Amino acid sequence: TIKISFECSDDLFIAEPYNILIYRWIKELLTNVYKHSNGKRAWIILSVERKLLKLTVCDNGTPTMSTNTLGMGKNTKHKGLSSIREQVEKLGGSFALSNNFPQGFRIEIEIVMNGGNSYQYFIS
């Protein structure tokens, strides 16, 4: 069992199709925490400031996993994190993976929500 804390403002609004992406990314990131981190806690922080959407997911698990274990290496059958990174980069965003002091991992994603541009082809 993993205890999950979720933090966002009461009036948070995420436009389509970004809401679907965020849902899928959170689902994949929490699945990774459950399967690979050996942690007992996960924290999700979601915010939007002037069209900049920020998603942070961290855990208190094992901080010394390799990139292959994390699904970021080339020689791995696990593609979850590398898939998220690719999607974020296609949207012109940033994806950062780091240690979560004192233990665990932290993933930070930032993307700009463009109201006029449609990325629906990207979600399908």
Where are these regions (language model features)?
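ATP phosphate-binding glycine-rich loop and adjacent ATP-lid/helix-beta elements
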Residues: T69-P102
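Short helix-loop "hinge" at the ATP-lid/N-box region of the Bergerat-fold HATPase_c
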Residues: V33-S37
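Glycine-rich GHKL/ HATPase_c ATP-binding element in histidine kinases
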Residues: Q103-I107
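Conserved short strand/loop->alpha-helix "switch" segment adjacent to the catalytic nucleotide/phosphoryl-transfer site
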Residues: F6-K27
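Short, highly conserved beta-strand within the GHKL-type HATPase_c fold
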Residues: L52-T56, P63, E108
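C-terminal end segment of the histidine kinase catalytic
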Residues: N114-S124
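Conserved transmitter core of two-component histidine kinases
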Residues: I2-S9, I45, F95-S98
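Short beta-strand/loop element within the Bergerat-fold HATPase_c
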Residues: R41-K51, C58
